[in-house]
Amino acid sequence: EMQLISSIYKLLNDSGNYDNEKIAKIFKEWNNSNLKSYLLDISIKKVLEKIDDKYLIEKIDDLAGDNGTGRWMLNYGIELGCSTSLLSSAMDTRFISNLKGERNKISKIIKQSPKSFDININSLSRAYQFCRIINYIQAFCLINAANSSYNWNISISKALNVWSNGSIIKSSLINLFYSNYSVEKILNDKTIITDLNDFKSDLIDTIAVSLKNDVSIPCFDDALNYFNQISNNSLSTNMIQAQRNYFGSHSIKIN
């Protein structure tokens, strides 16, 4: 969620059409809608915060750290065979941010001219909601896998209740999951799949804008790829199995 908001700020800021005041206004409007969240609220404050009459965010170096919880979750995802692609993308962005010397050198080779481009704010908001939902789906799948592998009995509904009170991920989206979706078996919920499919074109449009204008918005394309894969009954992995089989018997299954 932190990276999603950061990606949105970057896209809006790089468009040349949104200063910090305008970005904060958009975030405030979202925070009075079904996009309301604690993280969005603090992001509004940080976007507007000033020091010596300059916006603080524009003075902060872009080297991002981590306290290890993300790595811990990624390791569990690998151990349990669960996709945590959005978390992985967010962590990769932090790792790449620390290659400051290399980034400075490469940016001088590939010089990018200042540009101005349009962004459909309504599409951006729907793309944001799409990614947030996918992020929760991946978290729910990880919890279910842990329940199965470790004989745990974690109730996702109860976890949502905990997250909705005093957690940094507190948001109106949690209430949406409560009221609209079957959270314990989220991938079997036709309503959430239909809702995601309705938002999909907005996500594609948002990603297209970022690609055309060389703006990296981590997690957005990962959410789209996850949905395209989870909603497709024929993936490219039959070729993977064929390749693995070439190097020895890897128990390929013939339909």
What name fits each language-model region?
Residues M2-I217:
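C-terminal substrate-binding/catalytic lobe of Rossmann-fold NAD(P)-dependent dehydrogenases
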Residues N197-D198, D202-N255:
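C-terminal amphipathic alpha-helical interaction region
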